[in-house]
Each structure stands twice: as C-alpha cells, then as structure tokens.
Amino acid sequence: MRSSSIFVAIVTCVIACGPSDAQESSPVEQKTGSLSPDKKWQYNCGEYAPGYCYPEILKAGTTERAVDLDQELSVNGPEARDAEILWAPDSKRFGFNYSPPHAHHTRFTTVAFYQLRGDKWVALRQLPDYLLRRRSDYLPKGFNPRQCVREWDELKLREWTDANTAILYAPCHGRSSDLPAAFLLTLKFDDVGNWKIIKAHQMSKKELEEEQ
C-alpha cells in the first residue's frame, strides 16, 4: 500500500512540476546562437517583469557581466525580447539586432557591432540611420531612395560569412506597407574593427516575395 502511494506521489509531481519549470525559462535565453562559438561568452536577457527583460553579455557559466547592452544601447522593455545576437565564427565579434528608443508611430531596427580586445568587449562605430536614404556609391544608380519611408527604418545583420565579413539585410519599406526594394549589404571589417560596405546586392522580385 505504501509503495502505491509513493508511485502516485511521483507521478503527480512529474505532471505538476514539469510545465511549471518550462514556463519559468526565458524564451530569449533559449534562442539559438546565444552561446559564442568558443563557448566563453553567453547572451542573456534577464526577465525583470512579465514580458520585460534586460539584454547583456555574460562570461559563460557565470553571472559576471561583460557588456550591459541595456545600459549602452538603451534597449529594454518588451522590444528587448525580440533582440538577436549573431556571433562571428571566431567569437571575436558579434552583431546585435535590436530596436532602440523611437517614436510610437515609427518602426526602427538596427544593428550594433562589438569586438573583443584583450578580455574587454568594445563597441564599434555605429552604422548610420536611414542608410538607404543616403547617397552612396554602392547603391545602383536607378534606385530612388525617396520611395523608402522615414517612418520605417530597418537594418539587420543576417549572417557572418567569415570572421571579418557580415551580410546585412536592408529593406526599403514603401508608404503602402509594400517592399519596393531591398538590399543585402556586404560589410568588411579590418583588424581593429573599422568597417566598410564593399558590396550591395539588390534583391530580385522573387527574393522579395520570399521575404514577404
């Protein structure tokens, strides 16, 4: 009789405790790529209220903070949960896609890059806002930047092709929520972290349809 009671208690605990533990885990912490390739650094977005978290880089396996992304980039609140980190293959750089403070009637997403110097992470030169609206030699001559609305500015790191080369996604959003154009920009870094856009691929109509 006693063994039957123990069995029932164990089953009850498994059913009751299992979902509770899963709900306590932060969805941001489970994102793929939060751990650097060399497994020395960890991206974390610690929840301080339901739906709110503060992003940071920790030394893996510890609570020691290496970069306070909340403090440095003013990214917090519910939009911080949508932020994303992509590590360079050698773990010496990372790109952080996030939404900084902006007016409520606008949408603004950009990327910040950091580089490891010694044992310290240093912020690199920020990419300019409204990148597609600026006159640039790398954009095709037939492209009209005026078709891109100022109320929706988006620039995201898509992937690292090697330790010094990043591919950025830069869409041009139109006034009627359409996507008249989008570009994949190739960003090249030198040893000290200076970057330069060396190529701009205008996405085809088929590629745009796949994005939408």
Whereabouts are the PLM-identified features?
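Compositionally biased, low-complexity segments
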Residues: 1, 13-16, 87
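Bacterial N-terminal signal peptides that target proteins for export
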Residues: 1-7
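Acidic, small-residue rich beta-repeat scaffolds with periodic aromatic anchors
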Residues: 12-34, 48, 109-212
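Short N-terminal edge-element motif at the start of the domain
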Residues: 28-89
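Short consensus segments that form the blades of beta-propeller domains
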Residues: 45-49, 74-76, 100-106, 175-179
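Extracellular-facing segments of soluble proteins and assemblies that are Gly/Ser/Thr-biased and enriched
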Residues: 81-119
